[in-house]
């Protein structure tokens, strides 16, 4: 698929006082993209659309260039100690995505230009924990790879972490646009993960993302560039024929990764879950979705901040975990399963 290009761009005035802000302003001006001003990346008004659904879809192709003022990093367990905030929002239209509710009324994509401030804060966290390793997740609230061909913020983060003694970087993507990252000086300190799923899930619930085959071609490229490789199987979803669907996923993964060094391969396994607010938003934004959001079939699990979520019942969740682990053991016997949640 073609790399993401926004249809509309907003700038905070302060963003233009940073080199990246100036560079992006010149780039989008040359591309002929409409540019507007906003007082804050948190308060973007005037996104076009006659209905809420139309405004939502237009917001997904709107980029906001701003300054990150909150420099206290969120926790990102179990993936990493901290989430490093390079961007917020995503151009994809995955029906199940938790950003549907965490970003709520702000589904536009935000990128932050004060990278030196962000990296300085990351260095403080690294120094506090040294000599322990400190891991940073760069894709907690965005698919950073999908927009990085425009900003190169992720590339700078890879090289910043690559130069540290005790920092490590990780991120996950559904996009194939990795070429500009292949020559980054990562020094083996970045784990590049791809989100994969059964054909059913990708075909029905992941519009606006790269195909499975394109993701795998990109995975071969990044492995060839010496990055540590990982796969996030998420969300693991019990559709009709799911056992066969996920078997074919791992079988095809093994086939397409033949000849790649998989000595340090990782898998992360995340079952499908949703909240009541998410269900409302998903059904509003994707009224024809085939996603099964029937609470009566699920177990209610309390989460952080008192917000509960619906996950599979214990027996079904165990069956999912055991099945995935058995497929991984068969096709990738030396891989590490980092967690199932």
From Swiss-Prot:
Residues 76-304 form the Radical SAM core domain. InterPro entries: rSAM, SPL, SPL_Bacilli, SPL_firmicutes. Its EC number is 4.1.99.14. The keyword Hydrolase does not apply. It comes from Geobacillus sp. (strain Y412MC61). [4Fe-4S] cluster binds at residues 90, 94, 97. It catalyses: (5R)-5,6-dihydro-5-(thymidin-7-yl)thymidine in DNA = a thymidine dimer in DNA. Gene3D superfamilies: 3.40.50.12110, 3.80.30.30. PROSITE patterns: RADICAL_SAM (PS51918). Monomer or homodimer. Binds 1 [4Fe-4S] cluster per subunit. The cluster is coordinated with 3 cysteines and an exchangeable S-adenosyl-L-methionine. The gene is splG. Its cofactor is [4Fe-4S] cluster; S-adenosyl-L-methionine. Belongs to the radical SAM superfamily. SPL family. The keyword Zinc does not apply. This is Spore photoproduct lyase. GO terms for biological process: DNA repair; sporulation resulting in formation of a cellular spore.
């Amino acid at each position: 698929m073609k790399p993401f290009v926004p249809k509309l761009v907003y700038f905070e005035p302060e963003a233009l006082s940073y080199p990246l802000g100036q560079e992006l302003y010149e780039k989008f001006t040359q591309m002929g993209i409409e540019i507007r001003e906003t007082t804050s990346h948190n308060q973007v008004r005037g996104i076009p659309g006659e209905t809420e659904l139309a405004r939502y879809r237009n917001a997904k192709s709107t980029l906001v260039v701003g300054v990150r003022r909150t420099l206290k990093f969120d926790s990102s367990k179990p993936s990493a100690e901290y989430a490093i905030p390079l961007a917020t929002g995503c151009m994809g239209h995955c029906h199940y995505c938790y950003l549907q509710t965490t970003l709520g009324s702000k589904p536009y994509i935000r990128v932050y230009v004060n990278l030196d401030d962000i990296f300085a804060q990351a260095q403080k966290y690294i120094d506090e924990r040294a000599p322990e390793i400190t891991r940073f997740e760069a894709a907690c609230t965005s698919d950073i790879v999908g927009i990085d061909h425009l900003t190169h913020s992720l590339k700078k983060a890879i090289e910043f972490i690559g130069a540290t003694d005790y920092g490590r970087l990780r991120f996950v993507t559904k996009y194939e646009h990795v070429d500009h990252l292949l020559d980054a000086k990562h020094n083996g300190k970045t784990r590049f993960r791809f989100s994969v799923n059964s054909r059913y899930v990708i075909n029905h619930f992941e519009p606006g993302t790269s195909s499975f085959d394109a993701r795998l071609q990109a995975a071969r490229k990044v492995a060839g560039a010496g990055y540590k490789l990982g796969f996030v199987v998420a969300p693991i979803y019990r559709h009709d024929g799911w056992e066969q669907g996920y078997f074919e996923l791992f079988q095809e993964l093994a086939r397409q990764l033949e000849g790649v060094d998989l000595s340090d391969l990782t898998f992360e396994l995340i079952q499908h879950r949703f909240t009541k607010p998410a269900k409302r938003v998903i059904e509003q934004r994707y009224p024809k979705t085939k996603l099964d959001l029937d609470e009566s079939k699920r177990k209610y699990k309390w989460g952080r901040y008192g917000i509960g979520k619906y996950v599979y019942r214990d027996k079904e969740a165990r069956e999912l975990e055991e099945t995935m682990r058995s497929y991984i053991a068969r096709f990738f016997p030396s891989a590490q399963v980092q967690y199932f949640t």
